[in-house]
From Swiss-Prot:
Pfam families: Ribosomal_L19. Keywords: Ribonucleoprotein, Ribosomal protein. This is Large ribosomal subunit protein bL19. The keyword Ribosomal protein applies. The keyword Methyltransferase does not apply. GO terms for cellular component: cytosolic large ribosomal subunit. Belongs to the bacterial ribosomal protein bL19 family.
Length: 118
């Protein structure tokens, strides 16, 4: 392991829950306004994850007032306070960009069904 990899490894966050495209996420973001800071939640469907390592980012899409809003978050950014997985989605694609063209019920994603272990 070279020096750059070692530095990147120590700066990466450790408490990130496993999630995939299709999952509904609630991302808590730190917002600084002047000398005050607050945490704002952004809830939507993860439509993609890009790259890997410390440069990894993910895109979350939600519908707000009948307008689609997408935000790209760096995964290991200090402005991302927490990530919660609300529901797991069952999709067969890695990038869900086709959701941009769909409206209403057509844009729904099936929920993944779990079988309880016995």
């Amino acid at each position: 392991m070279n020096k750059i990899d070692a530095i990147e490894l120590e700066q990466m966050k450790k408490n990130i829950p496993p999630f995939k495209p299709g999952d509904t996420l609630k991302v808590h973001v730190k917002i600084v306004e002047g000398d005050k800071s607050r945490i704002q939640a952004f809830q939507g469907v993860c439509i993609s994850r890009q790259n890997g390592g410390i440069r990894e980012s993910f895109t979350v899409r939600k519908i707000s007032n009948n307008i689609g809003v997408e935000r790209v978050f760096p995964l290991h950014s200090p402005t991302v306070d927490a990530i919660e997985v609300i529901t797991r989605g069952h999709v067969r694609r890695a990038k869900l960009y086709y959701l941009r063209k769909l409206r209403g019920k057509a844009a729904r994603i099936r929920e993944k069904k779990y079988v309880a272990a016995q």
